[in-house]
Swiss-Prot record:
Protein name per the record: Small ribosomal subunit protein uS19
GO CC annotations, alphabetized: cytoplasm; small ribosomal subunit
Biological processes annotated in GO: ribosomal small subunit assembly; translation
Transmembrane segments: none
The gene coding this protein: rpsS
Amino acid sequence: MARSLKKGPFVADHLLRKVEKLNAKGDKQVIKTWSRASTILPQMIGHTIAVHNGRQHVPVYVTEQMVGHKLGEFAPTRTFRGHTKDKKAGR
């Protein structure tokens, strides 16, 4: 289910404060966050946000097409190494 329009999008307060502070300075630096559930807002466009994937921080450069999506969508948590080869096929 989608979030109620009355409530608005979820963005972690600490993340929003960091983005607004960098926008006020006009500075571009990597913002490290663990908040994968935060929604990408138009204020974040042009920033690089390092999103935690459970093991490391994955740098995500925010573009206009990402607005409205969650940060966690762009930092995959699982690494797929391929299916195992069938042992009978080798004979």
